[in-house]
Amino acid sequence: MAKEDTLEFPGVVKELLPNATFRVELDNGHELIAVMAGKMRKNRIRVLAGDKVQVEMTPYDLSKGRINYRFK
């Protein structure tokens, strides 16, 4: 899948789930399950409940996403 096919939305981490997954509520009210991107894991960027993040999603499955940036 090409990078252009992804959708990016800002959101807030609501809950930490097992296996490095997170429940994220987007700014438009939609809620989804997200995992951290590999570069964030590699650089040991911590994500906690209440953090504002940017979530990347595919148009084929809007219930799952990937956290690719944590806002400061």
UniProtKB/Swiss-Prot annotation:
The protein, known as: Translation initiation factor IF-1
Function: One of the essential components for the initiation of protein synthesis. Stabilizes the binding of IF-2 and IF-3 on the 30S subunit to which N-formylmethionyl-tRNA(fMet) subsequently binds. Helps modulate mRNA selection, yielding the 30S pre-initiation complex (PIC). Upon addition of the 50S ribosomal subunit IF-1, IF-2 and IF-3 are released leaving the mature 70S translation initiation complex.
Coiled coil: none
Record-level GO cellular component terms: cytosol
Protein's organism: Cereibacter sphaeroides (strain ATCC 17023 / DSM 158 / JCM 6121 / CCUG 31486 / LMG 2827 / NBRC 12203 / NCIMB 8253 / ATH 2.4.1.)
Family recorded in the similarity comment: Belongs to the IF-1 family.
Organism classification: Bacteria, Pseudomonadati, Pseudomonadota, Alphaproteobacteria, Rhodobacterales
CDD domains recorded: S1_IF1
Xref: PANTHER family: TRANSLATION INITIATION FACTOR IF-1, CHLOROPLASTIC
SUPFAM superfamilies per the UniProt record, alphabetical: Nucleic acid-binding proteins
Subcellular location, record wording: Cytoplasm
Signal peptide extent: none
Complex and partners: Component of the 30S ribosomal translation pre-initiation complex which assembles on the 30S ribosome in the order IF-2 and IF-3, IF-1 and N-formylmethionyl-tRNA(fMet); mRNA recruitment can occur at any time during PIC assembly.
Residue stretches making up the S1-like domain: 1-72
Molecular function (Gene Ontology), one example: ribosome binding
Keywords attached to this entry: Cytoplasm, Initiation factor, Protein biosynthesis, RNA-binding, rRNA-binding
